[in-house]
């Protein structure tokens, strides 16, 4: 992949070969604007290949769900939303489909297909130059443009820069906060990074013996006993606590609560596992779930099964074996309470090393939502996860990455 560029011919330097950087490269190539793409990993799109468990949840067609500078995110998506991103990928030849909850995936269900389409969108363009395995260490304004410094001592100049270097989540896949720190030298405020989509560490005694078990559940996060947020989906028990998408969605609120010195707990409701109609028909509010909203229905269900099947077969065919064994000797009222309102103290998260996405980042007040251009350093365009925007699980973070990359590519191409 590495191509050595001829010096001083690039009109734009893209720092970062992740989702937003690759999108920007495609836009510049289409506009026939000469550019240089610098990526510190030896392959482009490493983090992209891991998204959606390798399936690549391309975007989400539902209402936007963003945190941090969420108003900025709304303005970005008003300028380049899911429809425009869909047209962008259609133009690259990618076929995709919508799954439940507005989630969009490539037809092949393989992230590699998305990366192939993106790479093909620029790699053979006459003005495209790519260098992989190069660590950018510095960025400075000079004259009418910028100079980029690298760990190997090479320096590259261009009138415009697209900074798409990502955030510190998942460093094994290339995550780093280095360029975010570099931007503070140019006057951009940085909101502290912390895990936004990450497994939770909890007390483990109440869930001992359930390690590796996956079940559908509602999970409610509480601060000092008050419900803050809830999520539904697959829950995975682990030897350190809980994972699965519905737990990971709550990491942001868990981190903020713990940082504020609050008692943080989760309440687990396994009503979907029990097949209770209310759980399947509507999503309860956090206050209902935290209060054991399905406890009465669970008690009725267990009472009927006890009368019909007896104690030995009470949970057979209803619960996974490991969970049934845990409840077998409990009075059914306690079992119903456990199944619809199990409380666990949250002690932390698995950290940025294991997070899918980082919250925090470069404050967006000094960045144009229409062009992603810095107001402090004109000619510098900042896009993707390095910004103080993070989205819910389900394709929202990639949608924001594509949109910001496309807008930055358009604006930098026009100059």
Predicted regions and their residues:
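Beta1/beta-strand and adjacent pyrophosphate-binding region of the FAD-binding site
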Residues: 4-20
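Glycine-rich FAD pyrophosphate-binding loop
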Residues: 13-15, 29-53
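Short hydrophobic core segments
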Residues: 13-15, 38, 136, 155-175, ...
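Residue-level recognition of phosphate/Mg2+-coordinating polar/acidic sites
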Residues: 30-31, 58, 78, 84-87, ...
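Conserved N-terminal glycine-rich FAD pyrophosphate-binding loop of Rossmann-like flavoproteins
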Residues: 41-71
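Short beta-strand to alpha-helix junction loop
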Residues: 73-81, 101-120, 170-175, 203-205, ...
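A conserved short coil-to-beta-strand element within the FAD-binding core of flavoproteins
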Residues: 132-145
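A conserved FAD-binding loop/helix module that cradles the flavin
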Residues: 169-182, 186, 388-415
